[in-house]
Structure formats: structure tokens, C-alpha cells
Amino acid sequence: MKSVYIISVVLFFFTSCSRHVKNECLFQMNHVEDRKIMLSELIDSVEYVPLETVESSLLPALSKLLYVRDFIYASADMEIMKFDNKGKFIGKLSEFGNGPQDYLNINDYDIVLRDSEVEIWVCHQKGISRYNAEDFSFLGLISLDIPVLHFKYVSDDAIIIQTSGEHSFCLCDKNGVVRNEFLSNDPANLSHSLMQFIETEDGIFCILANTDEALYYNKQSEGLELIHYVGGIDNVLTRDDNRAYMERYGYLEHPQKVAQDFVNIVTFRKKGNCSMFFLRSGKGEKVLINKNGDDEWESYDIYPNPTIENDLLTGLDVRYLLTMSSCDSDDAFMMSIPAHMLAGALVNGKVIDAEDNPILIKYQLTN
């Protein structure tokens, strides 16, 4: 596809917004109520998972973390670490080099479930390399003629690629054959977060640079669509705003200016009927929560004057909720706390050292 088609499509009980006709969105925030609450009243089923710290498992302060089928995976420079569901270090993928099964860099990775097999896929300058998640053996290379910045596996016939080529996105198959291309390259509206793709039961989102638009893979229709995925947020950043500010202020000043003048959608997660959105503007940061899949939302300030009192990890700024943006779990909400923020605390019978690996916190929202 050489041009972008803007369509609206029925998605179960939701109707998406097209580029020009703004109907109901996948997430509609018509009714938002500001509240105050204790953190323990907001989340439950809390599980703390300190990731084991040994010389061969050291992680950077910021790492992409995935919890899939009771195992935890974490990116660390040129390696992918693997831990069990208690945080015990199991092993790592480490194939840096020039050989046919090696990679010279890791732009992104994903944990891919193919039938009964679990694989680690890594994208780099040569394409996407596949490895067995059990023994880290090399399974093959998907060669691509375009640079792969980020990717998300959907099926053998559908791999979403974010690229710096002529188009921003494309859809290819397991053989590297490009099926469709989307969005002419638009630097102002491309982000490069650790967790670039967000998966829900119905589809996969790639938020376009903190705006109200996303490239959306609809699992029902098996196609990519450009949609306004959220509605009801006043002064929300749009792609047009983003582009205009880039042209006006330039590459360096642009992010600060749009963060000051608009409401930016930092990230979101949806588990079952429960959704959490994190918003940032010149006035501060908020989390919006929905527990029933309707248009009734609860709004809580998390900075600078939080309306959530942290009674679970006393003394820790509730802004740590935002670490959800770098991690995801297949069965719960999850966040990642740098060890230095919990130094001296007793977690699962262990005193946390400032130099330890991050501590994962899995949780559900209260009913």
C-alpha cells in the first residue's frame, strides 16, 4: 500500500475514529472523576519479584522487561536475560558478533509463541534473528531490505515493522516479504520507547509519539489501520500539532514544547476490562483508570501533588507507577522499580542493595 487509507471499522463493542470523522474511539473518556485514594485500595494481588543479581545477570537501570508464560526476559545492552517467575537467573542470549547466527546490535526484541514453541526474536541491522528460548540456539534469520527499529510478531503472516525507510511502518511475513507499507516517514510522529507496541485482547497498538492516534493491528480483520484510539481528553496532542511544533521549534526544542502545551499520552495498558492511561502535560502527570470497560474513568494526580497515597512502599514516589511504560506481562499489570529506590527495604525476605537488579511488581486493579 503506497498511501494511507483512513477507515473506520467496528471492533466488537467499540467504534474507532477515522482521521477526519471522529466517532466513538476504542477508549472513550466521556466521564472522568477526580479522586483521592490509598494505593492499597487501588491495586491488589501484589507480587514482588526481585531479579537475581549475579555477575552474569547485571541489568541496566532501564530495561525492556517481558513476563511471558511464567518467565521474565530483560534486555541488557547486547544480551537478553532470562529469569524464572521468582526472579532466579536462568541464562541469557548472547550472540554478539559477525557470524551468520550473530547480531552486531539489538534494536528491539520480542518473545514469540509459535505453536508449542517459545522463541526470542531480536531485530538488528541485518533483519530479525530467531533463537530458541530454552537453550538460546539459533533458529534462522529473517532478512529485510529495510532498517528495523522496532517490531511486533502477530503471526507468521503478520509481523509489524517500524522502520526509518521511506515509510514508517510495514507489514511483512516470516520470509521477510513486505505485504503493505504505511505512513510516509514522519520524524515528528515517531517515538522510540522501550515498549513500542502495546497488545490487548483485540489488537496491537503503536502510539504515534504521545498523540491520540495509533497504528492499530485489528486481530479480527487482520489488518493495520490508522485510528484515533482515545477520545474525550481535552487539549490532547495530535499528529498535526506535533508536526507543526517540530517545524516551528526544531528537533531539540520540540519535545519540551509539546509536553508543556498539550496533554501527552505517555502509555497505557489494558488487561481484561481494566485499563490504565498515563498522561503528562505542563500541569503535571495523571493516571486514568477504568475497571469496567465503559466510559466511566477515575483520575488521580501522581505529580506534582499526588492524590494517591503510597501505603505499600512507604516513602517511594508514586511516579514509579510510570515504570509500566518499559515492561509488560501476559497476565497482570506490571512495573519495574530500580533497586536504588528500594535500597535497605526487605522484599521477599531479602534486603535490597542499591546495586541490585530491578524489582518487578505485578498487580491487578481492585474491583
Specify the residue positions occupied by each region the protein language model found:
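Blade-loop segments of beta-propeller domains
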Residues: E52-S56, F89-S116
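Short coil/turn segments at the loop-to-beta-strand junctions that recur within blades
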Residues: E55, S94-D102, S143-L149, S184-L190, ...
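Repeated scaffold domains used in trafficking and secretory/extracellular systems
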Residues: P60-K64, Y103-D110, I146-V154, N189-F197, ...
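A short helix->beta-strand "capping" segment at the edge of beta-propeller domains
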Residues: E33-L59
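C-terminal motif of bacterial Sec signal peptides marking the signal peptidase cleavage site
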Residues: T15-S16
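Short beta-strand elements that form the blades of beta-propeller/WD-repeat-like
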Residues: F71-A76, D110, E117-C123, D157-S164, ...
